[in-house]
């Protein structure tokens, strides 16, 4: 091990020890370690199977649900606290990791879209998950396609990684990457094709730029879309929600590929997060 790496580990872990005794959480340990060795994250993460969760909405819940499911299988899963989703926070997470009792090191990381490409210079995820891309964070990152291209640039750095996408989003149709791609989405009863109630993002057909219609529209621009001009339609789903059993303000029950699940939270958008978590666990 190089001297700079040793010093980085010492500085990072010592600061974490002190901060934890003071009852304070911080990304400072990662920041200190990176000042000694800018490549320290690469060394810390090299023996992990890594799942990256990104997107403008739902990252935190998807990550938490995924960690909960995987802990039942493996007992121990490394993850970063909500908000610690840039390189200093990710480095702190690996600095303070405990050794796995099962011998299988798994990390599920929530990563900020704008930081993802830089972080992927130092980690090798086996799975990328994009929850969705909506306009809520566009003040930070510009237009929807700018954010999407930032994420794709990161994914291209790890061409062997599988990419799990929300198949109900037209934005994710045939992404310009060489990676293997899988899709999750709602596979409920379809009706006549009609315009989305609230396509607030103004997403058009990804093939011919015509206005899309929907045989099933869950919310916003998500659902079983179809273009009546060129025939483009939602891709086949690998992980399917096939039934909504219950949906209230504080509870949801649903069926994914024949198995019923429930979460103590309402909202269709949260069911998408749960669907993504189940898909990750089954991957």
Q: What kind of region is each of these model predictions?
A:
Residues 2-204:
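Phosphate-binding loop of NTP-binding sites
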Residues 185-283:
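Adenine nucleotide phosphate-binding catalytic loops in nucleotide-utilizing enzymes
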């Amino acid at each position: 091990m190089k001297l700079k790496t040793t010093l980085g580990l010492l500085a990072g872990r010592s600061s974490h020890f002190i901060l934890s005794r003071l009852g304070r959480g911080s990304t400072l340990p990662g920041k200190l370690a990176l000042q000694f060795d800018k490549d320290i994250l690469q060394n810390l993460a090299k023996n992990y199977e890594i799942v990256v969760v990104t997107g403008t909405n739902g990252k935190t819940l998807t990550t938490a649900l995924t960690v909960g499911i995987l802990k039942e299988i493996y007992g121990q899963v490394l993850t970063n606290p909500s908000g610690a989703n840039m390189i200093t926070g990710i480095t702190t997470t690996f600095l303070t990791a405990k050794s796995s009792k099962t011998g299988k090191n798994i990390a599920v990381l929530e990563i900020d879209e704008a930081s993802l490409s830089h972080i992927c210079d130092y980690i090798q995820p086996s799975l990328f998950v994009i929850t969705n891309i909506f306009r809520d964070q566009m003040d930070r990152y510009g237009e929807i396609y700018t954010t999407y291209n930032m994420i794709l640039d990161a994914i291209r750095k790890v061409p062997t990684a599988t990419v799990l996408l929300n198949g109900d989003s037209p934005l994710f149709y045939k992404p310009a990457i060489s990676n293997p791609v899988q899709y999750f989405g709602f596979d409920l009863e379809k009706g006549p094709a009609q315009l989305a109630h609230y396509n607030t993002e103004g997403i058009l057909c990804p093939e011919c730029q015509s206005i899309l219609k929907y045989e099933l529209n869950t919310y916003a621009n998500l659902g079983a879309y179809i273009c009546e001009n060129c025939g483009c339609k939602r891709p086949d789903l690998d992980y399917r929600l096939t039934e909504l059993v219950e949906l209230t303000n504080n509870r949801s029950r649903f069926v994914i590929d024949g198995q019923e699940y429930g979460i103590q939270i309402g909202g269709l958008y949260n069911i998408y997060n749960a669907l993504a978590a189940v898909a990750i666990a089954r991957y």
